[in-house]
Amino acid sequence: MRAPIPEPKPGDLIEIFRPFYRHWAIYVGDGYVVHLAPPSEVAGAGAASVMSALTDKAIVKKELLYDVAGSDKYQVNNKHDDKYSPLPCSKIIQRAEELVGQEVLYKLTSENCEHFVNELRYGVARSDQVRDVIIAASAAGMGLAAMSLIGVMFSRNKRQKQ
């Protein structure tokens, strides 16, 4: 039997499983979350809008978790609690509520929804998704470079034997 999803508590980070990425929000109580959304987002489109990757601005929104998640699964994921001390819950909520309605800078690689919620909870802006993509891209690049080098070495060796 699968364990039930724990009920979020104010200040919890909510990880929403979108088809190709994870969207993040912070739970502020009474069923609501605060999260970043593209300024052009239409109601019901959710943060899965492709426009989120194409704009440099976002709007801080307070919406029902049910509406933000839509049909996507979500979980409480305070994954950095062992590394960073969460700020007091009242401060997390206050900071989140103060930002609602504001337009903020949005960069997929340095100021995205995961950076935003980690900054609110821990005072540290970080995104493991971005780090993981950079590591994977670096590994792929090194793999291609190694294959190219091996190809050049075999090519030279073959020419020398002729």
Swiss-Prot record:
The chain crosses the membrane at residues 134-154. It catalyses: a 1,2-diacyl-sn-glycero-3-phosphocholine + H2O = a 1-acyl-sn-glycero-3-phosphocholine + a fatty acid + H(+); a 1,2-diacyl-sn-glycero-3-phosphocholine + H2O = a 2-acyl-sn-glycero-3-phosphocholine + a fatty acid + H(+); 1,2-dihexadecanoyl-sn-glycero-3-phosphocholine + H2O = 1-hexadecanoyl-sn-glycero-3-phosphocholine + hexadecanoate + H(+); 1,2-dihexadecanoyl-sn-glycero-3-phosphocholine + H2O = 2-hexadecanoyl-sn-glycero-3-phosphocholine + hexadecanoate + H(+). One of its GO terms (biological process) is organelle disassembly. Belongs to the H-rev107 family. The C-terminal transmembrane domain is required for the targeting of the protein to damaged organelles. Interacts with PPP2R1A; this interaction might decrease PP2A activity. This is Phospholipase A and acyltransferase 3. It comes from Pongo abelii (Sumatran orangutan).
